[in-house]
């Protein structure tokens, strides 16, 4: 069963809005079941690749079943690997082949013996030993382990037996022979302590020492030794990275953070179970209460239907809800308060947010976010429940205990809590952006008196340089977002000898709408960059084709809107969201046209530079351009390279190279004075730069 076009478009827009950072993504079917889990170095690049035409059979089947998309942004690709492994083992998706077995990423185990040893393992046991990891890259882990065993004289034997003579490792100076009693436990433990500090992240001294050795090896031209030391430094830095999605703390715990702007509040819940990030939920609602009341109400509402963990981490006071949690759970629920930096409130849908929290974020399908709140929970009933819980706890426990605050593991918990807070903040930012686009389209419908909301808008712009290299750009916006796969460019050669913006606009409109592909949907609105002259030219073509598509022109100088058959332009307030939407479309069309225009000019200048060389005509100039890409690359080439590129004798290649190296003509100019169409239909003056 093929998904509907509207569903595919919704998923594609979600993919386009994904961040260009590493993370994990989940495809779900119509029943909400996870059918595929993947990780990506760039979420946006990876997700948008699913909507291209060419795919292998497996991917085509996957996309035919996909109905929802969810993604989680991570700080490092390393964490994406760990989280992918956890989620695959949790959901066992149908279309995942690897990582579905019980095999996990390896750990480093430091035993608790009198003379401990360190080794790689895949099993975690409650045996008193210390475990570090997991580590997705086994090769880097083995490199790090070899470095440890080279640097510190730690035993590698499985069983420590008393011996009269040490083994070969002692003679290789790789072991202090504790089996012979030649090293005291105290001296041995000093090395173990240094290894522990290294695994806990105290790497500055070790890395500095290795960097000195590497530089000394480079000065002595011992490059192989320097490369090995470089790999050791890289292994240390990778191994000691602290993961926020997996740790060795097996306690069940929840991290709850929230972010708000105005009356809109989003809560993010991260669930850690067995030392792994086991789940993430986002809930959006509206509230005008203070911080303590907002969090208390959410905790009571959420944990009325969910299991209460023994440990809960929040970034603001939970108030009376702390007692209610312990009373409902029947056991002590420890609520730890860890203050965080607050996020700046998003002011506009397109505002850029700068935070002090770690750059580890999560994004979720908006369908999974409960926009209307968790449940219908009135203020009166909530406060009554809080007071009742407080009375019950006071009667059974006496005075209220203080909320636990700082601890030795607070930095790690604060980082996870900051991740939850960033999840909540990004949900609000995304919600405001989507709501802003909807409001702008509705306002646009109102101002232009359109029959329906213009969900599909196509914009045109003309760009040229004094009448040369004339191009027209066509860009498409769907639901207020760019639809880049439907962008088009037109090389307008019919008017390449004179400046005629109106004729260029007529040609672009005609070429777009004369022969439309099968299944093509006409836009709800056409926007042209220009004044009444450009609008009239476009309308003339639409009338000739028998198309009744709403048309509007946006002039740059006064930001006036020109409508066909309207005697006066429409002037909107500079703060009007409809005007902002049209400006965004106009500017995108302008950018797209300018980029193509510059490309044509640069290519022409390069071809002319090659044509000035001896034995080079137009055909050979294009071949040289395709092979070398620039005049500078040609100058640094060999005669053999030139002869091979354009199939000429070696003597001619020597002549071409000699002329190129002696050439004083600038092959490419990066700055140009660009004479484009004027927004009001007037020709630009000499030397005027209009982009």
From Swiss-Prot:
Region (Disordered): 662-691
GO molecular function, one term: DNA binding
Keyword Transmembrane attached: no
Listed InterPro entries: GIY-YIG_endonuc (IPR000305), GIY-YIG_endonuc_sf (IPR035901), GIY-YIG_UvrC_Cho (IPR047296), RuvA_2-like (IPR010994), UVR_dom (IPR001943), UVR_dom_sf (IPR036876), UvrABC_protein_C (IPR050066), UvrC (IPR004791)
Basic and acidic residues bias (residue ranges): 668-680
Chief location category: cytoplasm
Domain UVR: 204-239
Subcellular location: Cytoplasm
GO cellular component: cytoplasm; excinuclease repair complex
Keyword terms: Cytoplasm, DNA damage, DNA excision, DNA repair, Excision nuclease, SOS response
Classification via Pfam families: GIY-YIG, UVR, UvrC_RNaseH, UvrC_RNaseH_dom
GIY-YIG domain location: 20-97
Protein's GO biological process: nucleotide-excision repair; SOS response
Function as written in the Swiss-Prot or TrEMBL entry: The UvrABC repair system catalyzes the recognition and processing of DNA lesions. UvrC both incises the 5' and 3' sides of the lesion. The N-terminal half is responsible for the 3' incision and the C-terminal half is responsible for the 5' incision.
Family: Belongs to the UvrC family.
Quaternary context: Interacts with UvrB in an incision complex.
Record-given protein name: UvrABC system protein C
Gene of this entry: uvrC
